[in-house]
């Protein structure tokens, strides 16, 4: 969405420098840009909530994912809606007429603009980061929790798991790596952009010292987080499938070895029984001959 709605307009705006479109286009662009940014921040949270539900409640219904997606898009729309009223075109008269799309005059005091920017920062960065940290922490704790080995002593109503699947360190390690990668990707993609933004908020004079292209590059880096998450999950899923295949092979080998040992043990017991029976028969025959 951000690539289709915001990036081409931004590229054209950077070429023309001033705003050449109408006022409604200015408001719409800034609304769509912020909505795309909100959705890029909220969708990884939805993925984290879905993964948490899949791990903690694997037999539960997955119908809640669509509701979470709808809530993420609806919340993105509502939080970006003020952009339609804050941004507008401003005309500067002079030897060279100039028009720009800005928020000049929308805030009566500097603290109001700073408060709005901090609120946006919390909704776009701090809250999603906290939510994902909680989700993936619960996933890691659930997967890393030591499982009671179930076998002949398993309580009634519980299934006995093969030993190759019980306490598998590879599954726990993959889950831990995935959680760390998701959080690290979100932090690396968005932190530079928001650090630069906070620098602007508390020191507006820095706007003249930092090239505008830097903020655009950092913004695109932040939006890169959205397509990276599905790639990480895809790589993790392929790794899990390979791991499950290896575990299946190991368990089948273990089962075959166990069956072979049981057959050897049964064969040895049969041989012992035959030997004992033949000895007893010989002793009985010897006693009968002696008595004669």
From Swiss-Prot:
InterPro entries: GPCR_Rhodpsn (IPR000276), GPCR_Rhodpsn_7TM (IPR017452), GphnRH_fam_rcpt (IPR001658)
Side of membrane Cytoplasmic, spans: 50-67, 137-177, 238-292
Biological process, per Gene Ontology: cellular response to hormone stimulus; G protein-coupled receptor signaling pathway
Tissue expression per record: Expressed in many tissues.
Extracellular topological segments: 1-28, 89-115, 199-216
Bilayer topology: Multi-pass membrane protein
Key words, A-Z: Cell membrane, Disulfide bond, G-protein coupled receptor, Membrane, Phosphoprotein, Receptor, Transducer, Transmembrane, Transmembrane helix
Phosphoprotein is among the record's keywords: yes
GO CC terms, sorted: plasma membrane
Chain segments annotated as transmembrane: 29-49, 68-88, 116-136, 178-198, 217-237
Record's comment on post-translational modification: Phosphorylated on the C-terminal cytoplasmic tail.
Any Pfam family the entry gives: 7tm_1
Molecular-function annotations in GO: gonadotropin-releasing hormone receptor activity
SUPFAM superfamilies: Family A G protein-coupled receptor-like
Disulfide bonds: 26-101
Location of this chain's protein in the cell: Cell membrane
Family listed: Belongs to the G-protein coupled receptor 1 family.
Role according to the record: Putative receptor for gonadotropin releasing hormone II (GnRH II) which is most probably non-functional.
Protein name, UniProt field: Putative gonadotropin-releasing hormone II receptor
Organism, scientific name: Homo sapiens
């Amino acid at each position: 969405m951000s690539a289709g709605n915001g990036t081409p307009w931004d590229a054209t705006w950077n070429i023309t420098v001033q705003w050449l479109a109408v006022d409604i286009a200015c408001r719409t662009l800034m609304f769509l840009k912020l909505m795309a940014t909100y959705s890029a921040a909220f969708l990884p949270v939805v993925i984290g909530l879905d993964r948490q539900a899949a791990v903690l409640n694997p037999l539960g219904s997955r119908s809640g994912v669509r509701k979470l997606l709808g809530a993420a898009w609806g919340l993105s729309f509502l939080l970006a809606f003020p952009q339609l009223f804050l941004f507008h075109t401003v005309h500067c008269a002079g030897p060279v007429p100039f028009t720009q799309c800005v928020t000049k005059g929308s805030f009566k005091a500097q603290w109001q603009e700073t408060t709005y920017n901090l609120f946006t920062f919390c909704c776009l960065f701090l809250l999603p980061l906290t939510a994902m940290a909680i989700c993936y922490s619960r996933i890691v704790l659930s997967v890393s929790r030591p499982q009671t080995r179930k076998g002949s002593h398993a309580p009634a109503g519980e299934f006995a798991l093969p030993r190759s699947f019980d306490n598998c360190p590879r599954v726990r390690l993959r889950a831990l790596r995935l959680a760390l990668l998701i959080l690290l990707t979100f932090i690396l993609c968005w932190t530079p952009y928001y650090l630069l933004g906070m620098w602007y908020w508390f020191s507006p004079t820095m706007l003249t010292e930092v090239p505008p292209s830097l903020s655009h590059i950092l913004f695109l880096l932040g939006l890169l987080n959205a397509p990276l998450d599905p790639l990480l999950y895809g790589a993790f899923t392929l790794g899990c499938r390979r791991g499950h295949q290896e575990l299946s092979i190991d368990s089948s080998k273990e089962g075959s070895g166990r069956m072979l040992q049981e057959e050897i043990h049964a064969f040895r017991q049969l041989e012992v029984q035959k030997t004992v029976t033949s000895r007893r028969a010989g002793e009985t025959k010897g006693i009968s001959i002696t008595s004669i």
